[in-house]
Amino acid sequence: MTSPPLPSFEALLARDDVIWMGQNTTHLEPAPEVLEALAESTRRHEFQVYAPSAGFTELRELIVADLELPGFDAWVLDGAVAGLHHLCMTLAPRVSRLITSDPGWPWPGRFMSVAGIPVTALPVYRQPRRLLSAAQIAEVIEPRSLIYLIDPLNPLGSSYDAVELAEIVGVARASESYLIHDATYRHFADNHTLAARLYPERTFTTYSFSKWLGLAGLRVGAVVAAPELLADVMAVPANPLGAGIQAQRAAIAGLQVRDRWLGVLRDTNRRNLGAVEQVVAHTGAGSVVVPQSQANFLAIDITDTPWHSDALCTAILDQTGVFIRPGTYQSPLFGDHFVKVSTSVPPDWADQFCAAWRSVAAR
């Protein structure tokens, strides 16, 4: 079954009636300190000058402290995806294969494919834990592979425990492989272990401000690694003129009020996750793939409904203005079976989604 494609982001931005619940972005009222940092940077016309290539020292130190990785270093970039692209392009001549998951985030695989590196996307949708396992990876790994772990996993919301992560690290170490630990959604998880603590010699951690702090449009993130490892891959940076100064000022301000902000953010996110789970259960239209998601989104399986994911997302947007994401964006194998709903949004947005689910999906 085919359906009209969803409108472009530019077309959606031109509308004033869209409820943004499809990009995993945070839409709560920002912390006043973040807004003031942006305003002050603008008043000082800092947008007229370049930032330090690696980012402001204060920001780099705050990122490392947030991750609790003493002795590590951070390189600030214009978004975590820029860091992923740089890592993929820099590591491509050194690695034999990229190992990732389906569902997952497709762009690292695309980056590596452009570089001529084979990509293996292992299926996890029907795995008991909805995650890559060490046994799966061991079946396909080659010497000097690159393993890409999204944790918590976008788009399902599952997260690795310390034992699972240690087993994967063991496979990586035995094959002298690199590991990218995409920690974009770490701040939403109840417990989170960083692979860098177990395998510092070949692990890169990617860090984003788009989700937990809501700075998606400002484009600021980082790559964190042991100093020698980071210096090696950043010897020729993709952007030697640095990430935007205004974005970095906002990120610094956010990290300075991190604990207070996360309390509000996590409480709101949990409330909205619960509301979405409840409406899915009460309507009987689909089922939540990972209950109690560890991220700011969840996936709803619609296999046993009359809907296909693209058609359902289009219908909900057209009829209610609520924008959610079809699974086809993130899973060639299973994408038609699920939709993804972002939850770090104002509670009334989540309630509007629930009304949309009752009126469209469950009809």
Where are these regions (language model features)?
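Short, conserved charged micro-motifs
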Residues: 306-312, 348-353
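Active-site phosphate-binding strand-loop segment of PLP-dependent enzymes
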Residues: 126-190
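Conserved core segment of the aminotransferase class I/II
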Residues: 205-270
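PLP-dependent enzyme catalytic core of the Aspartate aminotransferase-like
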Residues: 318-323, 330-363
